[in-house]
């Protein structure tokens, strides 16, 4: 990245973090786990700026509980301390927009969840350049460029 150029702003889905934190609990293939590691390294080094919604912490906590793993408080502290990651609260406008996005995308063939809507609404509200996810429902959105972690390449 050259001087004066700012790092891309990516909305990060919980599955990107979970692929690194608890790789054995993910259904993501190995190349997506390696891609998630690259994404998080770029975030730590400031080559990528990240945003997410507070639901991130709930999703991460749930997987720690489901997998009967310890270490959530350490993971939470690391996420909250990451200088290049902003975790946004779920505001009323964000919650409403997420519901509208869910209504727009959900069908019997596309189980677009309310959480999916929150990630997309967050990315749109913050004018993110892209969303990084392994979720096929988010990969199909049209309002924001969405990529798999393995597709992330630093500019």
Locate each region found by the language model:
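Acidic, PIN/NYN-like endoribonuclease modules and their adjacent C-terminal/linker elements
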Residues: 1-9, 120-155
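Short, well-structured N-terminal submotif of metal-dependent ribonuclease cores
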Residues: 1-52, 64-75, 136
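Conserved glycosyltransferase catalytic-site signature
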Residues: 14, 54, 113-117
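A generic structural signal for short hydrophobic patches within well-formed alpha-helices
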Residues: 17, 57, 95, 138-139
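Residues that scaffold the ATP/ADP-binding catalytic core of kinase and kinase-like folds
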Residues: 19-21, 63, 98, 141, ...
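Active-site-proximal, substrate-binding regions of enzyme catalytic domains
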Residues: 33, 37-40, 55-96, 100
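Conserved beta-strand segments of alpha/beta enzyme cores
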Residues: 49, 84-86, 145
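Active-site neighborhoods of divalent-metal-dependent phosphate/nucleic-acid chemistry enzymes
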Residues: 85-130
């Amino acid at each position: 990245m050259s001087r004066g150029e700012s790092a891309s702003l990516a909305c990060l889905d919980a599955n990107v973090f979970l692929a690194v934190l608890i790789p054995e609990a993910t259904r993501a293939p190995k190349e997506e786990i390696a891609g998630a590691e690259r994404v998080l390294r770029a975030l730590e080094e400031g080559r990528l700026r990240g945003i997410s919604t507070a639901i991130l912490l709930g999703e991460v906590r749930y997987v720690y509980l489901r997998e009967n793993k310890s270490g959530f408080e350490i993971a939470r502290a690391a996420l909250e301390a990451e200088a290049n990651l902003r975790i946004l609260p779920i505001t009323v406008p964000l919650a409403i927009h997420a519901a509208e996005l869910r209504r727009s995308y959900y069908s019997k063939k596309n189980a677009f969840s309310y959480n999916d809507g929150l990630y997309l609404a967050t990315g749109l509200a913050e004018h993110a350049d892209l969303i990084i996810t392994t979720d096929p429902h988010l990969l199909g959105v049209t309002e924001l460029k969405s990529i798999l972690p393995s597709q992330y390449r630093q500019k």
